[in-house]
Amino acid sequence: MWRGFGVLLLMLLLLSSNVWARTDTLLYPLKNIPLLSGNFGELRATHLHSGLDFKTEGREGLPVICVKEGVVARVKVSATGYGNALYLEHEGGITTVYAHLSRFSPRVAKVVRNIQYNKESFEVDENMLGYELRFHAGDTIAYSGNTGSSGGPHLHFEVRDTKTEHVLNPLRFLSVKDQTGPNVRGVYVYPVSNEGLRTSPYRVEVKNTGNRVFRGGRVCVPAGRVGIGVQSDDYMKDSWNKLGVYDLSVSANGREVFKMIMNELSFDQTFLVNELKDFHHYRDSRLVYLTFGNYQEQLLSVCNQDRGFILVEKDSVVDVVVDLSDINGNRSKIMFQLWGKFPSLEWGLAEGEKLLMNHQSDSLKKGKYTLWLEADALSHPFVCKSVVYSCVRDSVETIEVFSTGKQIYPLMKSARLQVSGKFPEKSVICLLEKNKRFSALKTRWTEEGLEASSRVLGEYTVRQDTIAPVILYMGRAGRKIRFRIADDLSGISSYRVEVNGKWCLFTYDAKNRLLEGNINEPVFVKGKNRLVLKVEDAVKNIAIFETDIYKK
């Protein structure tokens, strides 16, 4: 087993050295060396962060520059996700990505606009290599913004391997000022059964004893397997934003059982984010790295031995050392002991509970509700109790709920949920979120009833969506024409603006529910123009707004 782990570790180190060998210095994508608000490989809600987030002084419109001579390979415009995004290919086999842009440079914008009108669509995703739009290092290629799912003005920047499309750590190509090792906020020990069940973790109290060495003394735990969780973050010079950890390793009695170096990621692995973080701690705003798991070795940046678990024999003591460092080599160390003082935990099921194994397919059935899980949908075995109950919402309405547990549990593969029976037209399956809010799932009608896919276990109900989207005309502000559009349940699926019977380009900002057009679009003529806006939701409720727009 050790030989296999050694091979994996060697591969990880070779991968790291290959990245070093192939790197060349890039310019920063903003003219002044900017501060980071997010770094590569950070643990996010649904993914591992694939690039760097650069601060833009809290505003939009800063020039974004080409970091190395290259050609525009792709342009994507979306109301969500990356928003306005530009992809450039460069010599040396790398592609750089610039996202959440407010607008493109004039050369690019002209081509994109023509594509949008040809396709009659604001959202486009176009291969641009045929247009031969080449830029030199230092050229302005776009302007920073807040488009897509951005939570505030910033520039998201990525470096990718052009051939594999793997994302590479951009800090391998850029020099950064950082002289302090990662912070240690807490350490947790998770007892794990032979079946892989986890209990609530023990917290290890650690103190900084100087030189960024944190000591935690001796921790009494049940005999058996345990996993280690590390609550840590990092800072860079002149920035107070919490960043992710670059290098993290765990050793037990001098034997390395876990190693993470955030050099390279694949988009196929984004679902594994919950293999590296404690999901429930994350929901409580605590970033805890898990150094054990059944599927971590699928990540390009991780290798472990015995899945990162540490075996603590009864009455034995295990010395644990956790090493952390940033990309500049600034280090922190945690040292503590595990004492197998208590007997092994007894694991059992309460009445009505069911043990779901991660490597097996399974199903949960209660009344008219059936939920199917594929093998490897769960990251680890999970005890579940499925029930159907009624609850009162808003002191008025009683709803029926199918529950797999009060806490949401993330899945690595989507579960399939079927609700049997006859339902009113335009019914949808919804996930019941905090405060009894509904989040509609994409629902299919079948001979048996309704069916939907879900990436979490939680609580579900069925709702009928008979209300059309809401359109609010906000009037004109100079050349701008603005609308707010919203839907209360199934969500907006499409919109279309026509002026004088012809399609007109309106940008859509989904997070702010904002539609915006310009009276200088070519379909507007002098004098009176008839504008018609049609908005449709996911169950085909339609709202239409018509007005006259006058252009001088």
What are these model-predicted stretches?
Residues 325-330, 536-541:
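Short, solvent-exposed loop/turn segments at the edges of extracellular beta-sandwich modules
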Residues 328-350, 545-552:
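Short beta-strand elements
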